[in-house]
From Swiss-Prot:
GO terms for biological process: translation. HAMAP family: Ribosomal_bL28. It comes from Pseudomonas fluorescens (strain ATCC BAA-477 / NRRL B-23932 / Pf-5). Disulfide bonds: none annotated. The gene is rpmB. Keywords: Ribonucleoprotein, Ribosomal protein. Gene3D superfamilies: Ribosomal protein L28/L24 (2.30.170.40). Pfam families: Ribosomal_L28. This is Large ribosomal subunit protein bL28. Belongs to the bacterial ribosomal protein bL28 family. InterPro entries: Ribosomal_bL28 (IPR026569), Ribosomal_bL28/bL31-like_sf (IPR034704), Ribosomal_bL28_bact-type (IPR001383), Ribosomal_bL28_sf (IPR037147). Residues 1-20 are annotated as: Disordered. GO terms for molecular function: structural constituent of ribosome. GO terms for cellular component: cytosolic large ribosomal subunit.
C-alpha cells in the first residue's frame, strides 16, 4: 500500500541525514499517516481512510461529507 494521504495527497519526500561530521546519506521523510474510521451520518456507516494528521484536521474543519465527495470526484475509492 502506498504511503499517501487520501485527503491531502501528501506522500514521502527525500532528503539527507546529516551527521556531526557533515556526511550526507539519502533518506525518506514519511508523512504521519494513520488508519482512521470516520462515521458518515448520511450513509449510516463507518468509512476507513488512511489520512495524515493534517488530513484529520481538514476533516474536522470541513466535515467528512464534503471531503468524501471530493475524494470520490477525483476518482478515489472510499
Amino acid at each position: 500500500m502506498s504511503r499517501v494521504c487520501q485527503v491531502t495527497g501528501k506522500g514521502p519526500v527525500t532528503g539527507n541525514n546529516i551527521s556531526h561530521a557533515n556526511n550526507k546519506t539519502r533518506r525518506r521523510f514519511l508523512p504521519n499517516l494513520q488508519h482512521h474510521r470516520f462515521w458518515v451520518e448520511s450513509e449510516k456507516r463507518f468509512v476507513r481512510l488512511r489520512v495524515s494528521a493534517k488530513g484529520m484536521r481538514i476533516i474536522d474543519k470541513r466535515g467528512i461529507d464534503v471531503v468524501l465527495a471530493e475524494i470520490r470526484r477525483d476518482g478515489g475509492k472510499v
